[in-house]
Amino acid sequence: MTETEQTTAPIYPLKRNWTWWYLNDERNKSWEDRLKKVYTFNTVSEFWALYDAIRPPSGLNALCDYNVFRDDIQPMWEVPENSNGGRWLIVIDKGKTPEMVDAIWLEILMALVGEQFGKDMESICGLVCNVRGKGSKISVWTKDCNDDETNMRIGVVLKEKLMAASKDHSKPLFDVIRYEDHESCQKKTSSVVKAKLSLHSSDAPVAEKSAV
């Protein structure tokens, strides 16, 4: 490609800015000191250049996190955009292959930056991957944990994307996705938080259910 062709190549801007954050595994430091801003992107080419340049979730050490959040929202429960929110959570047990973990992350990431949640994009804050030795977690954070209607629509799209991506694997990428509010997660006294909403990979499609 000539220099002229490079400068005139389409940029394909995204609708909004997204910032990629990385939390390292240096447990002797505070959480804030472990969190690093990697890059803010707002075009398709920037997104793929960044994605191709860094390790996938399966390549991270245990206790590391990836966070991709929109419009300068910080990946913290305490900030105003997240304080009343919740998350659609996918728990990935150790039985899942590294390729399946990476497939879940990429599928949801592409859906977010590609604005595939329609009008409900305004209710989505970002995407988180927590890499842990006992099993990792991937979650989509939303602004209002009490807006069940919007959160369910987001969950349905999330399920549809993951079910479609599951066709490239020997079994579904997930068993269940659960919606939890952040406040309950912070105050939990056990490893399990009661879900406000849930969707199973074995459930009939929502369109079929609503017709009954």
Swiss-Prot record:
One of its GO terms (molecular function) is RNA 7-methylguanosine cap binding. GO terms for biological process: embryo development ending in birth or egg hatching; oocyte maturation; regulation of translation; spermatid development; translational initiation. PROSITE patterns: IF4E. GO terms for cellular component: cytoplasm; eukaryotic translation initiation factor 4F complex; P granule. Enriched in the germline from L3 larvae to adults; regions of the gonad undergoing spermatogenesis. Expressed in germ granules (P granules); when associated with pgl-1. It is found in: Cytoplasm. InterPro entries: TIF_eIF4e-like, TIF_eIF_4E, TIF_eIF_4E_CS. Disruption phenotype: Defects can cause a delay in spermatogenesis, temperature-sensitive sterility and defective sperm. It comes from the Eukaryota. The keyword Cytoplasm applies. Gene3D superfamilies: RNA Cap, Translation Initiation Factor Eif4e. It holds the Pfam family IF4E. Disulfide bonds join C125-C129. Coiled coil: none annotated. Keywords: Cytoplasm, Developmental protein, Differentiation, Disulfide bond, Initiation factor, Protein biosynthesis, RNA-binding, Spermatogenesis, Translation regulation. EIF4F is a multi-subunit complex, the composition of which varies with external and internal environmental conditions. It is composed of at least EIF4A, EIF4E and EIF4G. EIF4E is also known to interact with other partners, including pgl-1. Interacts with ifet-1. Recognizes and binds the 7-methylguanosine-containing mRNA cap during an early step in the initiation of protein synthesis and facilitates ribosome binding by inducing the unwinding of the mRNAs secondary structures. All 5 eIF4E proteins bind monomethyl cap structures. Only ife-1, ife-2 and ife-5 bind trimethyl cap structures which result from trans-splicing. Translation of trimethyl cap structure mRNAs may be regulated by intracellular redox state; disulfide bonds change the width and depth of the cap-binding cavity determining selectivity to mRNA caps. Belongs to the eukaryotic initiation factor 4E family. This is Eukaryotic translation initiation factor 4E-1.
